[in-house]
Amino acid sequence: MVGIDALRSEAERLRSDIERHNHLYYVEAKPELSDYDFDLLLDRLVQLEREHPELVTPDSPTQRVGGTITKEFPSVEHREPMLSLANTYSIGEVEEFVGRLNRLLEAEGAQGRDTVAELKFDGVAVSLLYRDGLLIRGATRGDGRRGDDITVNLKTVPSIPLRLGEFDGPFSAGEGREVEVRGEVLMRKEDFEALNDTRPEEDRFANPRNATAGTLKLQDSREVARRSLWFVAYYVSGLHDEDTRHVDRLKLLETAGFSTGNQYRLCHGIEEIEAFMQFWDEGRRALPYETDGVVVKLNDVRQWRLLGATSKSPRWAIAYKYPASRATTLLRDIVFQVGRLGTITPVAELEPVHIAGSTVARSTLHNFDEMRRLGVMPGDRVVIEKSGEVIPKVISVLLEERPPGLSAKELPTHCPDCGTPLVQPEGEVSWYCPNEEGCGAQIRGRVLHFASRNAMDIENLGESLVEQLVAKGMVKDPGDLYFLREEELAGLERMGEKSARNLLQGLLKSREQSFARLLFGLGIRHVGRATARELAKACSSIEVLKEASFEELSEVPDIGPVIARSIRDWFLKPAIPSLIEKLRRAGLPLAAEEPGPLVNTNFEGLTVVFTGGLQRHDRSSAGELVVARGGIVVSTVSKKTGLVVAGKEAGSKLEKARKLGLRIITEDEFDALL
């Protein structure tokens, strides 16, 4: 029988080998093992640690796999502010910046004027905190002073070392020594495209940065691990020698196991900076990840401290952002889409063109007036522009390339979906289809909005299924969803008994959503998520909201006369009483959880923290109950906290609350206040 010491030695060897191959694959892009052989190593380590839990270490590669469900991300304070950089689109302003640095440093008698030019990665900024070489916390930038603790998700990113590389020098730590590393979390272009391919059209991410941001805030770390994120480091503090040059720090980061992107240059003058910018203006297209500019910063870290920072940005660095990417392509056709509120939107169908890291085949033309202003015709060569995260748009027509015989697209006078004559309300730019109850496109849009993630979050209900349900007359409004039968669903295309049951289960689960979510899901014009929350606070039920006068609605925070009129008009529509009755019969939340002030104001002005496990509420729903009664929910305990609700196995938050002498109540007492 193999002894525990031999197994411990094998586990240590496996951990070392796996981390080395991880680094070769994710950081150096020089893999030595096939995926199969790598998986064999990892599987063996997983087996050892499962059979002998005492062999598990905090920095084991098995801790990256994920599996933790996190219902909230507590707010944490950064060791030092994560400031944003001043930015410019002008090379001339970069020259002025360098000149200003030279003058300031000369006035201070500082020696050395070298700068470092490095690529500006278009990702999500995070901070990693290491204590005694071990990763103990990872946080988002947040507002620059406080961010969300997303350690559990960042641990799944293979290019983030769980333990700093072993070597003598600035990283060598005494007991309790903390080192902070900052950088960007990215999603490679090919991983972004693969992720979007798995998502329905209406739920696709606009760009890799949005996909990365959304991924990092997922509650299930297993899904984060599946999305192949990547980390690039650009800053480190907490070294023994804080006076190192920036280029030396980048090399230290590489030695410690981080990727720095390897795309930086020590520059001795503005000419070298401009050469770097010009090279990467074109060269960045070939990179596997998105970049949107170049950061120029002083190389001497002592000069960083000498020049300091404004309240928003450091004085020793600037970000040069490349001008918007442009491309020319053929405009194949112009189609007219109908939105859930009946808005008619012209959309340009384009010959697919690659621009700023993505392929563009469609672009909105916004409205008929914009179409006329551009003068676009099917068959034109057009200029497409994309700047940063902005959705690509048509900005001009190449009139000199217009073929003879083209003609303008005839503007519709009737709805493209149902044929109803279009109307243009006085004072508005857009045209609308007024056939709200009979237009299939509007019905589909309203049902999809009702089912969306931020509304009722109905699982297993996608666009293609909604299209079938509406086309067959099975669903005429969101209320009809709750009266669908398994046998009729199972007979639909690409369904079956299992899919039908899954949808019905999703509908059943959606009945647990809050009144505020339901109000948002109803799709009342101008009523967004925040407005729906304010309405749910002010009005205890759908009936109270219906009876509220124009003047009463106008007095609700964030609701002016335009929104008040929109709410009143919505209740006057002939189909609304029937919809409300269906939702009532289906058992949906047509009232706040407790009668409100219109609910009681026991939490009015209170800052509330939940800690420990609640038995009758989840954190999200409990928080909504507090907000509906005028309170504010936060995740950290401070002197400003007004109330702490302590559930089972409450930990450090409860202890801190006691030390601060804060008011602490049980879940039973919380329920009594509702």
Curated annotation (Swiss-Prot):
Protein origin, superkingdom: Bacteria
BRCT domain span: 598-674
Residues forming the catalytic site: 120 (n6-amp-lysine intermediate)
Sequence positions that bind NAD(+): 35-39, 84-85, 118, 141, 184, 297, 321
Entry annotated with the keyword DNA-binding: no
Binding site for Zn(2+): 415, 418, 433, 439
Reaction(s) this enzyme catalyzes, per UniProt: NAD(+) + (deoxyribonucleotide)n-3'-hydroxyl + 5'-phospho-(deoxyribonucleotide)m = (deoxyribonucleotide)n+m + AMP + beta-nicotinamide D-nucleotide
Keywords from the UniProt entry: DNA damage, DNA repair, DNA replication, Ligase, Magnesium, Manganese, Metal-binding, NAD, Zinc
Biological process according to GO: DNA repair; DNA replication
Molecular-function annotations in GO: DNA binding; DNA ligase (NAD+) activity; metal ion binding
Cofactors: Mg(2+); Mn(2+)
PANTHER family noted in UniProt: CHROMOSOME TRANSMISSION FIDELITY FACTOR 18 (PTHR23389), DNA LIGASE (PTHR23389:SF9)
Purpose: DNA ligase that catalyzes the formation of phosphodiester linkages between 5'-phosphoryl and 3'-hydroxyl groups in double-stranded DNA using NAD as a coenzyme and as the energy source for the reaction. It is essential for DNA replication and repair of damaged DNA.
Protein family per UniProt: Belongs to the NAD-dependent DNA ligase family. LigA subfamily.
Protein name as catalogued: DNA ligase
